[in-house]
Amino acid sequence: MRRLSNKGEHQRNLNDRQRKVLYCIVKEYIENKKPVSSQRVLEVSNINFSSATIRNDMKKLEYLGYIYQPHTSAGRVPTDKGLRFYYEEMVKLSKETEELNLEVDTFRSIPLADPEKVLLLAGNLLARLAEGYVLIERPNPRDLKILRVMLIPVSEDYLIFSILTEFGISKITPIRIHEDLNWEEIERQLNFLLRGRTVEDVLTGKVETLRGSGILKLIESVMNEKLERYIDVGFENLLKDDTLSLEDIKHLLEEIKDHRFLESLIGNDKDVTVKIGKEIGSKKLERFAVFSGRYYKGSSPIGSVHLFTSKITRYDRNHRVFNYVLNRLSEYFTSAARR
């Protein structure tokens, strides 16, 4: 906590010119991936001061930990602290400009009964526009409301047991039957008991009539089928990034196997969380930046989204694209739940 306070104090110690110099250095380095000299700052900005003044500003920025000099006579390179400054300044600027004009109609063309397609579409859109690796968490079927239960006899010995939940997500399994019962009446009674209840309510015994019954055990077996928790898209973008090594990418793949690591990246509020380099908390991931956030059904979070890129990335673009995708997913699942 102390370090955060010092960082804010350091930023207050920068005058407007020094903030412009720092912003220019980071932006130029992100675009060209080459150390930035004082002369280059003057060439690409509207700062009307001498090269000597800019060099003095750069010395102060280096002293405060925003930039560093990789070797003598080289230009300057932003540190994680410098990248964080750039991201926060960019967010302030983006609030004063128009929102990014993205493929707004794309989500409207997907049927409301096909959430898997929507998640894949969102992942592909984010990975392509942000040039990063995307993980999208699927909604947990146990948290969804049951819309309908169906028992469909298909032969003398088998029937199909189907549970349809919100967003068109269904679980289907064939079951062997040993006696001829009135399956239509059983289906009607099950729908009376289960419709509008969450799967979690049923499995935790909140529907008293079903406690200890064969139907409850059947629902448990259907809902506990293995489902990959995350959709992943855009891995090839990391391989194409010349600021990342294969070793860096290998370390990332090892870390994301642990779902607790992914959960640790998200803040406690609705805001997007951005962690840059050392802020991620793993020495092996210091070359990365990660954008993390949740998407919602109404006011309830139902899944998370993570975007991994090199920390030398287009923060302005990625911030807007990431927020756009989160907002569209929340709109989609909120609308689907109201049908």
From Swiss-Prot:
Note the Pfam families from the entry.
HrcA, HrcA_DNA-bdg
Q: Name one GO biological process term.
A: negative regulation of DNA-templated transcription
Classification of source organism = Bacteria, Thermotogati, Thermotogota, Thermotogae, Thermotogales
In which domain of life is the source organism classified?
A: Bacteria
Q: Which family does it belong to?
A: Belongs to the HrcA family.
Transcription regulation keyword on record: yes
Q: Does the keyword Transcription regulation apply?
A: yes
Tell me, in a sentence or two, what this protein's role is.
Negative regulator of class I heat shock genes (grpE-dnaK-dnaJ and groELS operons). Prevents heat-shock induction of these operons.
Q: Which GO terms describe its molecular function?
A: DNA binding
- Keywords, comma-separated and alphabetical: Repressor, Stress response, Transcription, Transcription regulation
**Protein name (Swiss-Prot/TrEMBL):** Heat-inducible transcription repressor HrcA
